[in-house]
Design a protein with these regions (language model features):
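Rossmann-fold NAD(P)-binding glycine/threonine-rich loop
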Residues: 1-11
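Predominantly a Rossmann-like dinucleotide-binding segment in NAD(P)-dependent oxidoreductases
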Residues: 18-93
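Short aromatic-enriched loop/helix-cap "lid" or pocket-rim segments at secondary-structure transitions
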Residues: 24-26, 50-55, 106-107, 135, ...
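Hydrophobic residues in well-ordered beta-strands that form the structural core
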Residues: 12-14, 146
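Contiguous beta-strand/loop segments that form the cofactor/metal-binding neighborhood of enzyme cores
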Residues: 80-154, 190-199, 234-240
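A general structural signal for well-ordered alpha-helical segments in protein cores
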Residues: 24, 79-80, 154-155, 186-193, ...
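Active-site loop of classical SDR/Rossmann-like NAD(P)-dependent oxidoreductases
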Residues: 176-190, 206
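C-terminal helix-rich "cap/oligomerization" subdomain common to oxidoreductases
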Residues: 7, 116, 191-240
């Protein structure tokens, strides 16, 4: 698709709502306040309304591996794409997950290591269980807390209390964003329209490089978990 977009000089952008969200952009602008970043943690676990049918033996589209829409592809990407957008490609990946009876990946937990950044990352995703955990970016000087990584209605900065002042001072949570007054998809569509009107092929936010690197990460997760789709044109054998 990227080759064809270049050939025909058309605009191509991944439809990722998370990173064009104004609150996520605000988070990115304030990352420096965290000091040395030590960990990225993101969770998106949502019990699918179609899972009950699956347990009854009825395979609907949301749990059909023929459609290449397993848990990591469907909702796990919302935890991984922002990580790659902020920190780039990890140096190592260790994935664990649950495969359902038809080979469909129901959920996963993945640990990442960034050697040059001296930080780690962990993501959780599921279509077969709920979680209500917020997501965080943890630094030596403070923590960013994101209520929902995929739509980021609220982003808070919580500074670290200096050593020795824990009894006399309390950390004051600062809201960096505000509840969205428009659908999260509005900002995705606006970014795409702006690119077309400005004659640009590639978004600086949802860039081609970020999309490719995210797919490389997901391919490695799939390789480790043994997730294969009929649409795969080659076996997933490469490692990072």
């Amino acid at each position: 698709m990227m080759e064809r977009a270049m050939e025909y000089r058309v605009t191509l952008m991944e439809a990722m709502i998370s990173t064009v969200n104004p609150n996520f952009i605000k988070l990115k602008e304030n990352l420096g306040r965290l000091g040395k970043i030590r960990r990225y943690f993101a969770s998106y676990c949502q019990y699918s309304s179609r899972y009950d049918k699956f347990k009854e033996g009825v395979i609907l589209n949301a749990f059909n591996p023929k459609l290449s829409n397993g848990s990591v592809m469907d909702i796990g990407i919302y935890t991984i794409y922002p990580m790659v957008a902020l920190f780039g490609m990890p140096d190592s990946i260790q994935a664990e997950g649950v495969l359902l009876s038809n080979g469909f990946d129901g959920q996963g937990a993945v640990n990442f290591k960034y050697d040059q950044l001296d930080m780690t990352a962990t993501v959780l995703y599921s279509k077969i269980a709920n979680s209500f955990l917020p997501s965080e970016i943890e630094g030596e000087d403070g923590t960013m807390m994101i209520d929902q990584i995929h739509i980021a209605q609220n982003v808070d900065f919580i500074p670290r209390i200096p050593t020795g002042q824990g009894q006399s001072q309390k950390a004051v949570r600062e809201s960096l964003g505000s509840p969205l007054d428009k659908s999260p998809y509005y900002y995705e569509i606006k970014e795409f329209i702006d690119l077309i009107q400005e004659g640009k092929q590639i978004s600086s936010i949802n860039s081609w490089d970020t999309s490719l690197d995210t797919l490389r990460v997901i391919d490695e997760i799939r390789r480790q978990l043994g997730i294969a789709y009929e649409a795969d044109v080659c076996e997933l054998t490469s490692k990072l």
